[in-house]
């Protein structure tokens, strides 16, 4: 029969393993290599950086923001849970956030298990810090 401290160590090991797997999948999401993921930008983000007279500016802005999200390097301060699901960056002098959320495959509810791709679709949202 395991003791309380042994159970705590087991729970901690499971939590670390879950966080590592989430981090791995989130890295794939950020890099655009995860089929079960999509990236969206908020309306405020698009309005702040796109030229309404130039429809092609939307693609240029989306590409620039995605490149910054992909290039994000984590430090201990911005990844407290080890899942690499949130970041902060600047674009054209404005502070932005990106956040990965875990949904069920219908995108209606939260995922039961973010480490199981058969149960989880990721949505990476890019937004102005002021929209958070």
PLM-predicted stretches and their roles:
Residues 10-90:
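Compact soluble domain cores
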Residues 83-132:
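Short, compact, well-ordered microdomains
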Residues 1-2:
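An acidic, glycine-rich, mixed-charge low-complexity segment common to nucleic-acid enzymes
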């Amino acid at each position: 029969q395991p003791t309380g401290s042994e159970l705590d160590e087991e729970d901690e090991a499971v939590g670390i393993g879950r966080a590592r797997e989430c981090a791995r999948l989130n890295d794939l999401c950020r890099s655009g290599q995860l089929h079960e993921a999509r990236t969206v930008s908020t309306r405020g983000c698009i309005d702040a950086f796109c030229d309404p007279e130039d429809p092609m500016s939307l693609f240029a802005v989306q590409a620039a923001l995605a490149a910054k999200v992909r290039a994000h390097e984590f430090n201990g301060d911005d990844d407290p849970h080890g899942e690499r699901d949130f970041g902060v960056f600047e674009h054209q002098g404005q502070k932005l956030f990106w956040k990965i959320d875990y949904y069920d495959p219908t995108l209606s509810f939260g995922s039961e298990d973010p480490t199981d791709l058969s149960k989880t679709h990721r949505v990476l949202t890019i937004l102005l810090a002021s929209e958070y």
